[in-house]
């Protein structure tokens, strides 16, 4: 995910844990920007790329869950966008602007459970089955019994969830499926390296600007424009941090409560709590989701994914970075013409962020080729050779 997703493909990117394009350390702290140049790492609001935002309420046995969606467009099929693990719907921001300018379509970018601004009663359940049901429930809550034509597009973990959703027939009006940057074989091979990758990431950041700068310099996201909007959905303020004065009073309160403990353990406990709070004060931003704690679900996301993808009886598109490799099942399926594939060179794992225009062109061409959507502004299809 630039976090989890990238780690899952450790074996195929040239820059695993040394991250792509860097040739340097994971932290990216020593990477050079070029003499005399200063880039703008300030965050950009979602409203520069999406037309509206909505919190969709879904009823279930435990109560109400609220799913954040970002929307654009008013005509044509709905492109339902599912992000990778650790990311959010905002990772689709630049792609949204690009695709809307090429074909008539509607965008619905969804924050999956435990990600972004979505709030659910059971955030620990990240099984493929549960997340696929979430997608179906959101579609039903938004459109009722007569949903418009929908194409599912997912990146990495989101691509796997799109496939599980499609194979379970949870979206009745589904007309197409697109999987980006995920292949079962390489994903499964990389699972053993994932925890090491996650441990190598910074745990906290001094500011949003600092987080954005790290994501670009480390190679997590190679496109600064996308990073400036996408990273806002990946990090959050540490809990309990409001102001320096507020933080100080919290530390003092902790110390007073500890005074009744035995002297030896008391001083150690106090120092640890003070150190933790000082870290939060100096680095008040952290990741929205602790991906390392989701390990028990990783296998379920990707095992059997190739056959599930091939079995979906709808037009399918697979977009891969230049370093991706097809596994045996996908290779045979591609030779048999069971799906359209396009390789986008010079991209990292976050293909749709690194090259949003190329991905938009590929998706737009797919939509027009199958007569799912009409072109806009004289857009000319470029049909790939594979």
UniProtKB/Swiss-Prot annotation:
EC number of the protein: 3.1.1.89
Biased composition (Basic and acidic residues): 268-280
Top-rank taxon, per record: Eukaryota
Region (Disordered) residue spans: 1-38, 254-280
Keyword Hydrolase set for record: yes
PROSITE patterns attached to this UniProt entry: LIPASE_SER
Isomerase found in the keyword field: no
Reactions mediated catalytically: [phosphatase 2A protein]-C-terminal L-leucine methyl ester + H2O = [phosphatase 2A protein]-C-terminal L-leucine + methanol + H(+)
UniProt modified residues of type Phosphoserine: 15, 42
Modification(s) after translation: Phosphorylated by SIK1 following increases in intracellular sodium, leading to dissociation from the protein phosphatase 2A (PP2A) complex and subsequent dephosphorylation of sodium/potassium-transporting ATPase ATP1A1.
SUPFAM superfamilies: alpha/beta-Hydrolases (SSF53474)
Biased composition (Acidic residues): 254-265
Keywords from the named record: Hydrolase, Methylation, Phosphoprotein, Serine esterase
Modified residues (Asymmetric dimethylarginine): 16
PANTHER family membership: PROTEIN PHOSPHATASE METHYLESTERASE 1, PROTEIN PHOSPHATASE METHYLESTERASE-1 RELATED
Family: Belongs to the AB hydrolase superfamily.
Record function comment: Demethylates proteins that have been reversibly carboxymethylated. Demethylates PPP2CB (in vitro) and PPP2CA. Binding to PPP2CA displaces the manganese ion and inactivates the enzyme.
Subunit structure: Binds PPP2CA and PPP2CB.
Protein name: Protein phosphatase methylesterase 1
Species of the source: Pongo abelii (Sumatran orangutan)
């Amino acid at each position: 995910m630039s976090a989890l997703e990238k780690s899952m493909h450790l074996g195929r990117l040239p820059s695993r844990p040394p991250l792509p394009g860097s040739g340097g350390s994971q932290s990216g702290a020593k990477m050079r920007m070029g003499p005399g140049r200063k880039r703008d790492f300030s965050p950009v609001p979602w409203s520069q790329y999406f037309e509206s935002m909505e919190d969709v309420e879904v009823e279930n046995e435990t109560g109400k869950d609220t799913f954040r969606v970002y929307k654009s467009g008013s005509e044509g099929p709905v492109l339902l966008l599912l992000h990778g693990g650790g990311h959010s719907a905002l990772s689709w921001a630049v792609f949204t602007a690009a695709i809307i300018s090429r074909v008539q379509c509607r965008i619905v970018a969804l924050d999956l459970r435990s990600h972004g601004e979505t709030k659910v009663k059971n955030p620990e359940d990240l099984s493929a089955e549960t997340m696929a049901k979430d997608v179906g429930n959101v579609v039903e809550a938004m459109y009722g019994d007569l949903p418009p034509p929908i194409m599912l597009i997912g990146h990495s973990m989101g691509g796997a969830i799109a496939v599980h959703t499609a194979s379970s027939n949870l979206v009745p009006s589904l007309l197409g499926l697109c999987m980006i940057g995920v292949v079962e074989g390489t994903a499964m091979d990389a699972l053993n390296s994932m925890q090491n990758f996650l441990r190598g990431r910074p745990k906290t950041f001094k500011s949003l600007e600092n987080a954005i700068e790290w994501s670009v310099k480390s190679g997590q996201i190679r496109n600064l424009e996308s990073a400036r909007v996408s990273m806002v959905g990946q990090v959050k303020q540490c809990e309990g941090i409001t102001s320096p004065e507020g933080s100080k009073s919290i530390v003092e309160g902790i110390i007073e409560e500890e005074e009744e403990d035995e002297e030896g353990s008391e001083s150690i406990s106090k120092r640890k709590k003070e150190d933790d709070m000082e870290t939060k004060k100096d680095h008040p931003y952290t990741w929205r989701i602790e991906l390392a704690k989701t390990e028990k679900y990783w296998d379920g996301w990707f095992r059997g994914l190739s056959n599930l993808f091939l079995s979906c009886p709808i037009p399918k598109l697979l977009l891969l970075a230049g370093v991706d490799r097809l596994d045996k099942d996908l290779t045979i399926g591609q030779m048999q013409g069971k799906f359209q594939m396009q390789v986008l060179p010079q991209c990292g794992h976050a293909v749709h962020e690194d090259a949003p225009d190329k991905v938009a062109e590929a998706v737009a061409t797919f939509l027009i080729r199958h007569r799912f959507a009409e072109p806009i502004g004289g857009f000319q299809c470029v049909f790939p050779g594979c």
